[in-house]
């Protein structure tokens, strides 16, 4: 099973009923697998704040996890107000973001949609979410998914 499939099944098992998102370059492989598998329906929206607010509303309405999926940098940063609001109100919203691959990250080149540093996005979300993870190691990814989803449920 691919990592994205494992993530989708874990989200569904923890009460997510759908994903709200906007496909973008760094997240396109994820979105392709979401559509291929059909584990959770994908609702594409036209503006990232709407993605965050829709995920928050879904979490509150259904009582499970709300899921927002966006691309790295500009896409994720555009969800900050909605995600911070959900965090303040203890609404369990999970944000899934694409990111540069290891080779791109190691290149030292400035990438489009990048903040001042490659980890700027991670640091911003550390301030407005109860848990964060980088799923870049298949050996630890399953445990990291479980840790983050458990934190989202328990701290809501």
Can you name each region flagged by the protein language model?
Residues 1-156:
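N-terminal alpha/beta PP-like core and its mobile active-site loop of ThDP/TPP-dependent enzymes
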């Amino acid at each position: 099973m691919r990592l994205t499939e494992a993530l989708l099944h874990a989200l569904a098992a923890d009460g997510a009923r759908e994903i709200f998102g906007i496909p973008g370059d760094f997240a396109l492989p994820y979105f392709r697998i979401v559509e291929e598998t059909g584990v959770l329906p994908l609702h594409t929206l036209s503006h990232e704040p709407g993605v965050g607010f829709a995920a928050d509303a879904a979490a509150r309405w259904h009582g499970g996890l709300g899921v927002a999926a966006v691309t790295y940098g500009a896409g994720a940063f555009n969800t900050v107000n909605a995600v911070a609001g959900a965090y303040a109100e203890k609404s369990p919203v999970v944000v899934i973001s694409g990111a540069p691959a290891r080779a791109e990250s190691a290149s030292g080149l400035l990438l489009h949609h990048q903040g001042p540093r490659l980890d700027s996005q991670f640091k911003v979300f550390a301030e407005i979410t109860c848990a964060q993870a980088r799923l870049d190691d298949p050996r630890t990814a399953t445990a990291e998914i479980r840790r983050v989803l458990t934190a989202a449920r328990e701290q809501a």
